[in-house]
């Protein structure tokens, strides 16, 4: 009996169902952080300021179904849109797969748990502030959202 490879290894982003596409989101929340664009160089500057709809504990949108109505500049990721988006974090599953890479061990589709993205230190949990409290974005420029994280390996729990 042969094991069937996971869908993200056998289908292109264009071929995925809506459910498969949505499941690629690891729930890190990095894409929901505000970004600035440097005028002269056009460089993306990441901040640690989260969209007001991002739940800073779960790192998920608190109103995903209505997000684009409530936050008009919220970007809807699609396979076609990926080519024009240069600000997705390097750890983002959509970006990784579009670049021909694979998902990391901490991705929920690989680990089988939605908690590994937090346990590995990949998510914005404990690192971001809501836009409601932040003040000027220029005061919150941060490098970490735009770098490939060096995840912490989970602790092995030994039976007592």
Curated annotation (Swiss-Prot):
Cited Pfam families: CxxCxxCC (PF03692)
Task: Write the signal peptide boundaries.
Answer: none
Q: Which InterPro entries does this chain map to?
A: Puta_zinc/iron-chelating_dom, UCP006173
Please give the family membership noted in the entry. Answer: Belongs to the UPF0260 family.
Protein name per the record: UPF0260 protein GDI1595/Gdia_1801
Q: Highest lineage ranks of the organism? A: Bacteria, Pseudomonadati, Pseudomonadota, Alphaproteobacteria, Acetobacterales
